[in-house]
Swiss-Prot record:
Organism: Nicotiana tabacum
Gene that encodes the chain: HSR201
Catalytic activity: benzyl alcohol + benzoyl-CoA = benzyl benzoate + CoA
Keywords associated with the record: Acyltransferase, Transferase
Protein's name according to its UniProt entry: Benzyl alcohol O-benzoyltransferase
Function: Probably involved in the formation of volatile ester benzylbenzoate.
Entry similarity comment: Belongs to the plant acyltransferase family.
Pfam families from the UniProt entry: Transferase
Record-listed E.C. numbers: 2.3.1.196
Positions annotated as active site in the UniProt record: H167 (proton acceptor), D382 (proton acceptor)
GO MF term set: acyltransferase activity, transferring groups other than amino-acyl groups
Expression triggers: Up-regulated in the leaf during the hypersensitive reaction provoked by a pathogen infection.
Entry-linked InterPro entries: CAT-like_dom_sf, Plant_acyltransferase
Gene3D superfamilies per UniProt: Chloramphenicol acetyltransferase-like domain
Keyword Transferase (UniProt): yes
């Protein structure tokens, strides 16, 4: 069941006045254009990340706020575009005005210990809005700070590092690269071990642009029957998939798909279960968008140090009836094929589509979007106090349309089992059904040919 300790936790945060942290040295004043993969409507939002750290006696009386502030300023010398502001040109083209103004920073103290958050840190986190304060007039896509960072000291000597990123600037690997650099500088490095590479022109549209692949992820879908997720009464819960849960789910995998990855399995199961919980019309189309990192799909691969967005949203499409009535293998095959669609040509085709179609938003009507950050490295970021107890997305359901996106986050439960935790955001009525369907499939005596089940239990 859900952890009650952290969900009912109440505490007070005292914040200092927000300030701007500029690069520690003068940086170039120039205009740098985003790529046509960065520059799409579906990335024009802020994404929250949170990291929890224990007290480390070897750090003595060092103040994490002061250490991290200094490290950010030093890191921005290398990542100076983050200290600028986004502007919009002709054709809605985004560019960074490298003004050197700096990123937004908040210093805070909380009258709570890390232990009070519970022994299994996972989204949703209590009082997130206090740990990552939405500084007034700071959250716009244009003419606003591109990063907001809050460091909150805890009563026990630990601290919380929370960050909000303008997603048009970077994807998860790019953000982790920046955070890792801040950690290295905080530990005394004179330069990041991986130097940042801009080169956004590598993911620009061709001249002339030519869409050569099918991109149903950008279809214009009308919400004819009011099936966009209602934004009121949204419920956030996290679900843990450890070895026993994954093993239980694999019982439903047909023999010819037995080598499927855990990502493919979970995506098929969650998509199916989520669709049944929302109860769309049987003949309506439903979609699963799988974020695929395309860095290695290029020949040659994108350069080491590239920190822009370099992923695609390949999509699996079927009807609600086919998804719910067919065995799990049906959804699994759709997901497997979708992942394999992403090639260098596919990425070039997406960039061309952005220019030709006016930078459209990916389809959100009856859509489930999943992003795997299990190898993202958030938890490895070390500012001198060791690795994070928890590091990764602060909540699920983020984006322009809440409730669409979920993340696969590496997690160790209190039994010491390594697994994946998945934050899910659904309306209250749907969450009840979702949990019921999940429980059903995990039962030892669950009927293997029953297509009406799809999966897992809330994280303990």
């Amino acid at each position: 069941m859900d952890s009650k300790q952290s969900s009912e936790l109440v505490f007070t945060v005292r914040r200092q006045k927000p300030e701007l942290i500029a690069p520690a040295k003068p940086t170039p004043r120039e205009i740098k254009f985003l790529s046509d993969i960065d520059d799409q409507e579906g990335l024009r939002f802020q994404i929250p990340v949170i990291q929890f750290y224990h007290k480390d006696s070897s750090m003595g009386r060092k103040d994490p706020v002061k250490v991290i502030k200094k490290a950010i300023a030093e890191t921005l010398v290398f990542y100076y575009p983050f200290a600028g502001r986004l502007r919009e040109g002709n054709g809605r083209k985004l560019m960074v005005d490298c003004t050197g103004e700096g990123i937004m920073f908040v210093e805070a103290d909380a009258d709570v210990t890390l232990e009070q958050f519970g022994d299994e840190l996972q989204p949703p986190f209590p009082c997130l809005e206090e740990l990552l304060y939405d500084v007034p007039d700071s959250a716009g896509v244009l003419n606003c700070p591109l990063l907001l960072i809050q460091v909150t000291r805890l009563r026990c000597g630990g601290f919380i590092f929370a960050l909000r990123l303008n997603h048009t600037m970077s994807d998860a690997p790019g953000l982790v690269q920046f955070m890792t650099a801040v950690g290295e500088m905080a530990r005394g490095a004179s330069a990041p071990s991986i130097l940042p590479v801009w080169c956004r022109e590598l993911l620009n549209a061709r001249n002339p642009p030519q869409v050569t692949c099918t991109h149903h992820e950008y279809d214009e879908v009308r919400d004819t029957k009011g099936t966009i997720i209602p934004l009121d009464d949204m419920v956030h819960k996290s679900f843990f998939f450890g070895p026993s849960e994954v093993s239980a789910l694999r019982r439903f995998v047909p023999h010819h798909l037995r080598k499927c990855s855990t990502f493919e399995l979970l995506t098929a199961v969650l998509w199916r279960c989520r669709t049944m919980s929302l109860k769309p019309d049987p003949e309506e189309e439903v979609r699963a968008l799988c974020i695929v990192n395309a860095r290695s799909r290029f020949n040659p691969p994108l350069p080491t140090g590239y920190y822009g967005n370099a992923f695609a949203f390949p999509v699996a499409v079927t009807t609600a009836a086919k998804l719910s009535k067919n065995p799990l293998g049906y959804a699994l095959e759709l997901v497997k094929k979708t992942k394999s669609d992403v090639t260098e040509e596919y990425m070039k085709s997406v960039a061309d589509l952005m220019v030709l179609k006016g930078r459209p938003h990916f389809t959100v009507v009856r859509t489930f979007l999943v992003s795997d950050v299990t190898r993202g490295g958030f938890g490895e970021v070390d500012f001198g106090w060791g690795k994070a107890v928890y590091g990764g997305p602060a909540k699920g359901g983020v984006g322009a349309i809440p409730g669409v996106a979920s993340f696969y986050i590496p997690f160790k439960n209190k039994k010491g089992e390594n697994g994946i935790v998945v934050p899910i955001c659904l309306p209250g009525f749907a969450m009840e059904t979702f949990v019921k369907e999940l429980d059903g499939m995990l039962k030892v005596d669950a009927p293997l040919d029953n297509s009406n089940y799809a999966i897992i239990r809330p994280a303990l």
